[in-house]
């Protein structure tokens, strides 16, 4: 079986890591290739190539629709793919239309977001594009129930027309380790600090500006607090400037994109995620496997919540209210809450493999 995954980049974000984790466990019987529109090489491209995956780079749609379509058409005509799996949500119709014209009979549109903040123009585009995407797709996927309902509609979800592809993780990699905690905290000279962590792309969605303002309030309550930010993105320089303006440079650690996130979360005392919108964030599954408590925006779905140490707060609450909740949180749980659940990759991989096979067999009839 040959599957072509289409995504914006492979730079280590939640969706990228999810795809890598799934693919790395299925390459023995499935050939996965990738189409990306990013001009720069992502950190996951080399590991995927080592697994035997091909990475195709094509232009973005805004650089010219015909150019984009022709490049994708060449990939599809030069190779035989049983499935095309597009991760751009309601925007997938463009690629799926090309795939249909090229004879790809199994076409998946995947929603990774729920209740996204939109301008009027964006909302109109979604409302107009979603029905077209449904026409050109043969399968609808989503990362969770909320993402399924928001993107594909209550009716499609209730009628079982949407498959929930779990944002699963290698649960055992996130087991809490006192040794790793001590090593990392010593390495960054934060052994006696109260460490607040965040793993997210620096983007409007993840709301780093609000997080920095919250942290400024935390420092007034706990002078020993430090903020560990893992990731990068288009707003990173803006956030760094904000940190400088607020005089927090010595208390904020910019880690960049890291491959050792399972180790780094051991060093944290609490996780903070004030996102404006989310589908079902992989990071929250990961930290539950580590036993790390979290303070989270109410805009984030609760459907994957197993931990009793998750606190949900509205974004309308003040930065001081957030700061108090974070400052009062203590790391109590250390057991892996994800292992042997539906979010354990060992279980979820077999389920997804079966789904792919079922799709191909059904379309082959």
What residue ranges belong to the model's regions?
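Acidic anion/phosphate-binding donor-loop and adjacent secondary structure
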Residues: 63, 67, 149-153, 160-161, ...
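A charged, aromatic-enriched C-terminal amphipathic alpha-helix characteristic of glycosyltransferases
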Residues: 14, 331-365
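Short hydrophobic beta-strand element within catalytic cores of glycosyltransferases
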Residues: 35-36, 293-297, 302
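Aromatic "clamp/platform" in nucleotide-sugar-dependent glycosyltransferases that forms part
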Residues: 257, 276
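N-terminal strand-loop element at the rim of the active site
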Residues: 5-67, 161, 234-236, 355, ...
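Short His-centered aromatic/hydrophobic patch
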Residues: 86-92, 111
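A conserved mid-protein helix/loop that constitutes part of the nucleotide-sugar donor-binding site
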Residues: 13-21, 194, 198-217, 234-240
